[in-house]
Every structure is written in structure tokens, then in C-alpha cells.
Amino acid sequence: MKISRLPDRLDRMPMLKILVFFAAGIALADRYELPLWFLAGAFVVTGVLALSLRSSAATAAMILTAGFAAAQFRAPRATVPRGVHTVYEVTVEGFPADRGRYAVADASVAAWRDPADGRWHASDARIRLYADSLAGLHAGERIRCRGAVRPFRGGAESYRRLMARRGYAGTLWIAERTLLERLPGRHAGLHRRAVERLSRLPMSAGAAAVVEAMAAGERRGVTPELRTAYSRSGLSHLLAVSGLHTGIVFALVNLALWWLPLFRRGHLLKNLLAAVAVWLFVAAAGFPPSAVRAAAMCTVLQAALASASEYVGLNALAAAGFGMLVWNPSWLGDISFQLSFVAVAAILAWGVPLCRRCRTRWKGVNVVVDAYLIGFVATVATAPLVSHTFGVVPLAGLAVNPLAIALAGVVVFGGALWMLAPVG
């Protein structure tokens, strides 16, 4: 693309410009703090200037102020005391991972008791729950225990900031003697039922860990050795449900429903069923942020296909990203959000045009070339982020990504069919 055509292309992608200034406001709020009354006044003043003077600079300032205010207003706040030994009511989320002498699971704190006056206080904080082998943890159960929520220790400072952005207040260790009561558990959600269905398949422990991680986003069986092996080969992105997995389901569902447009209004039914299938897959995976972003973009694309309107991929991606940042501004600092967004943007901006330029007369060759080019572009685009965050650039992924994506398509789509099938 020529530089001279960049302003014209940006004019056709208004959501991309909005996203840039909104994200800049969120980034500034991470470093500075301003009174909300000041931000409200600045938003009104810049909005009036933008309307009266039709000033693009005032519009940009208004959007930046909105991002700053949203980040400051929606900043994660701990609703549990840290370092205070008291009683907590905790719900275990997902499936606990067995680490030998202890088990670990994500959990949410429903309430905690004030040790000073004995009063209970509601909470919505998330914690990383550790329990020794005698206590035992079960997916979805509610427990009442005694302990203290403590800040994350060890690891890099970036990891602690990441957990804070994701709403984690800290860690809580429990033992058999500090486990006071097991309460009636909540009903199994779609994610738990999906993982339970996958666990019925006759597979080895290693294969089950990979299938559960790729199809349902459940990483309980992923051992440190398996994670390291995938990371060194440049395939660690396959072990967490992300935009790649959602895109595989989107593409294969549309391919499987190719025959519906042969009937009257069949194209509308096809688009509706494809969108529903994508969101069901994301729900079965537990709504990971990168998959939600991809599902939102796929829905925009599906709606564009249904209405036969012009689809601009980057604009749709920007709209999905803007909506997610409005919902949760802290996702801007989430490395999984950053990687998936950069990868998809690079594929749309460079990968798709590159695939068109390398088109041949042989369809089989085109499929292989397209898979390699898409993997190459995504790997190169995300290499700076990966290098900065993890200190390694997995160049091996450039060679093995095409085959890995093809195999991932079989695992993800087959797993999705098994999880969501109404029988079995």
C-alpha cells in the first residue's frame, strides 16, 4: 500500500481512529490520575468544541478523555482485605489442576467476615486458590475456609500487574484444618459440562491435556514440561483458546453450511447459525478475552455477509476492540489481548493482500501457501511483543505453523462438535 493512499484508507476506517485515541487515554490513565470532575468537564468542553468548530483535534481530545475516564472509573479495586486472617466464602471456578502435593484453581470470593465485628461483606474479587492434597478441590464447589489473601509473590513484576488487570486480588492457601465447611455448589455451567464431555473421550493424559486446552480452554492438564515444549517450538498459542481457534470454527462452520443458500432465505439462516455456533464455542471455552474479541469480529463479518454490505476488516476489528475496552479498559494491558489483536490486524493488513499476490492456478498449493503466509505474518508481527514480554522469539514456529494450524483445525472443530452435540 502506498503511503499517499494511507489518509484515504483511514477515512474509510473511522473506528480505527477512535480506537487509537481511546487506547491512548487508557494508557495515560495507567500512569497518571486526575479527578473525575475534571475529566467530566474536559469531556464536555472538548465535545462542545468538536461540534461547534468541527475540529478533528477537539474530537480526538474528547475520545482520549473518554478513554482516560473509563480506565480510571473501571480500574480493578480489591474488595477483600489482604493480609488479614479471617473467614472467606469461596467458589471454585473451572477445574483444579493437580500439582502433586497441592492443587491450584481460579476462584471467586463471594463474601468475607470482618474479624473486628463479625459482619459479612460481599465481594466479587478473584483469587488464585491453593489447597493441599488432603483438603481437595472440586470444580464449581463452594467452600467456607479460614485464611488470608496475600499479594502475588515471585515472578516478574509484569506478571503481577497482569493478574491485577485481570481482577485477581491475590492468593489464598487452605489446608484440611482451615477448611470449615463445604456448601452446596452452583449448577454446572456450559464450560464445565463441555470439559466433562471431553474427559469421556478415550485418550492418554498428554493427548487429553492438549485437546482440553485447544477445544475448551481448560489448562488443568498442561504440565510445565508440555508448556515449555510448545513454547520453544513456537506453538504455545495453540494451548489457549484464542482468535485462531475462533476463526477456525467460524471458517469451518461456514464451509459446512455451504448448501443452505440453495434454499429460499437460506443465506440468512446460514449466517445466523454460523454466528450462534461461534458464540456457543466461545461460551464452552469460558469466554476468554481473545476469543470474545474474535467472536465479536466474526459476528460483524457475518452480519456484513448477510446484508451484502462492504466489509472492511480492520474497521470491524477496531470496532470489536473498542467495544471490549469500553467494557473492560484493563484488557489493554493484557498480553493475550495485545497478541491476538496485533496478529489479526497484521493478517488483515498484510497477510490477506500477500496471499492474493501469491495466488496460483492450483487450489491445493494455494491452501498450503496461504497457511504458511498467514502464520509467517502473524509470527513476525507479534515477535516484538513476544520478545519484550517473554524474552524469546520462537522462529521455529515459522516452519511448523502451517501443519500445526491444519491439525489444530481438526482438533478444535472435532472437539467443538463433541462438546456441543445434543446427544452422547
Q: Each PLM stretch: what is its role?
A:
Residues K17, G25, A29, W37, ...:
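Hydrophobic alpha-helical transmembrane segments in multi-pass membrane proteins
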Residues W37-V44, L339-S340, N401-A406:
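Alpha-helical transmembrane segments of polytopic membrane proteins
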